[in-house]
Amino acid sequence: MKNVTDSFVSLGHWPSAGSFGWNTDILATNLINLSVVIGVLIFFGKGVLSDLLDNRKQRILNTIRNSEELRGGAIEQLEKARARLRKMEMEADQFRVNGYSEIERDKWNLINSTSKTLEQFENFKNETIQFEQQRAINQVRQRVFQQALQGALGTLNSCLNKELHLRTISANIGILGAMKEITD
């Protein structure tokens, strides 16, 4: 570990060519921290994410089944309404002379109200599915973010010890001293 730290310290002694150039100090560019965080996110997040997605999938499928049952009930009501419509049409034939226009108006009102009811059930089903999907996505995002933060904090706390902290401070002081000598 000391050789790795020394190699990073020696990278800091390279003279810079001006105000523009490549930053060769790997500690200053945060590549190690980013790779550790990404690795932790991938390692801890994929199992949690798959479990959450499976649970949400089951809930969404249950919601879809419930919506399909509601749809089935609406279709059943529609069939009953159609049966009543057929019955009314037979009565209309019998009473055509007296009240044809009134029966026709009742028929269309019944068809329209049944169609509106069926359309409302379809809209409710679609809104429920969309709401459940959005809620599932939000819960997964929140859960992954919490897991990532907990994993990153745990990794950082387990990796930082007093000796490493003191060596890093000493290396940074050496880099600053070398930079001061270069600028003087």
Swiss-Prot record:
It is a single-pass membrane protein. The keyword Lipid metabolism does not apply. It comes from Jasminum nudiflorum. Its main location: plastid. The lineage of its organism: Eukaryota, Viridiplantae, Streptophyta, Embryophyta, Tracheophyta. CDD domains: ATP-synt_Fo_b. The keyword Transmembrane helix applies. This is ATP synthase subunit b, chloroplastic. The chain crosses the membrane at residues 27-49. In plastids the F-type ATPase is also known as CF(1)CF(0). One of its GO terms (cellular component) is chloroplast thylakoid membrane. It is found in: Plastid, Chloroplast thylakoid membrane. F(1)F(0) ATP synthase produces ATP from ADP in the presence of a proton or sodium gradient. F-type ATPases consist of two structural domains, F(1) containing the extramembraneous catalytic core and F(0) containing the membrane proton channel, linked together by a central stalk and a peripheral stalk. During catalysis, ATP synthesis in the catalytic domain of F(1) is coupled via a rotary mechanism of the central stalk subunits to proton translocation. GO terms for molecular function: proton-transporting ATP synthase activity, rotational mechanism. Belongs to the ATPase B chain family. HAMAP family: ATP_synth_b_bprime.
